[in-house]
Amino acid sequence: MKLMKLLKLNINNNNNNKLLLKNLLLLMNKNRLMNKLSNNNKYLSELNNKGNSLQHLNNMNNWKLQNYNYNKNNTINNYINSKLINKLLYKLMSLKNNKIIISKPLYKINMNVINIRFYYYNMNNYNYNNNIYYINMINKLMNRLNINMNNLSNILSYYYNKKVIIEPIKLKYLYNNNEIMTKYISLLDNNKYNNGLLMEYQRTLNNIMPKLNDHNISMNYINNINNINKLKYNNILLNNNNNINNIYNNININNNMNLLMFKYLIGWSIMLKGRLNKNISRISTTYLNNGTFNNKKYLWGNLNNNFKLNYINSNNNIYNYNNINKNGKYNIKVKLNYI
């Protein structure tokens, strides 16, 4: 009986200590906020500056492997296995049709399930004569990946001792994934564009890229950020005399947040560097810029200086690709800017 009472007392003391620590942290945070609220303009400008970086609002991470980490050796094995499976998927997807480009697969490894997701794009999307063949071919591939009894997911399940799910996602447009877009550009015939490379690439890209309404979209995005900051500021003012726990619970910004998650492409930049032309022996560099990466100051000067639209890490997707053609080695760097 005495032991039971002692255990209960210890549990109660631990709970009380946790509550006390939580309240102390909240009080310290409240004092910090109240000190800043003494100068309203200063605090609002600080919120706006944080909104410009957008990291606290749009935390979309570019990850390739999410691993349930319970064993370091197992983590290393999962990484090595993912490399082997990547090669297998590349071979499998190009077995029937070499016009299919796939991105690097994403692995999400949990206790009981492994989810493998990758994006693919068919370069014959605009060739309507191949539609029936393409549909039949994709059906066969899906059977091999997930549906048939002897499919790849079942084989990998035996290997991992847990369920494996493969999710191939078809992309309608190249610019939905920077890796696929970079691979597509690398497959274009550079020798065909020896004279007038810049013009030919621009013509090709204009056919596959959206007609950007980037300026208006960016202004709406910035206005939404400012509205969110005002909501946060007003919420703190309204709750500063109430229970401190309510400061973080009474704000609702879901309506604005729905507009912020990688829905719009507002700029793209492509750099081609290397031996791209038979007639020029030296290494040349070519830049193609559009949208927020456009160098026209009268369009983007003020916005880029104030809001750093091209330097938001969570919104920028960058991919490099090296290749060799008949003229020599060259590099392609693609930057896509989403909001």
Swiss-Prot record:
Main location: mitochondrion
Encoding gene per record: VAR1
Name of this chain's protein: Small ribosomal subunit protein uS3m
GO-annotated biological processes: mitochondrial translation
Molecular function terms, GO-annotated: structural constituent of ribosome
Keyword Ribonucleoprotein applies: yes
Subcellular location: Mitochondrion
Keyword terms: Mitochondrion, Ribonucleoprotein, Ribosomal protein
GO CC, alphabetical: mitochondrial small ribosomal subunit
Function: Essential for mitochondrial protein synthesis and required for the maturation of small ribosomal subunits.
Similarity comment: Belongs to the universal ribosomal protein uS3 family.
Naturally occurring in which organism (per UniProt): Candida glabrata (strain ATCC 2001 / BCRC 20586 / JCM 3761 / NBRC 0622 / NRRL Y-65 / CBS 138) (Yeast)
Lineage: Eukaryota, Fungi, Dikarya, Ascomycota, Saccharomycotina
Keyword Transmembrane: no
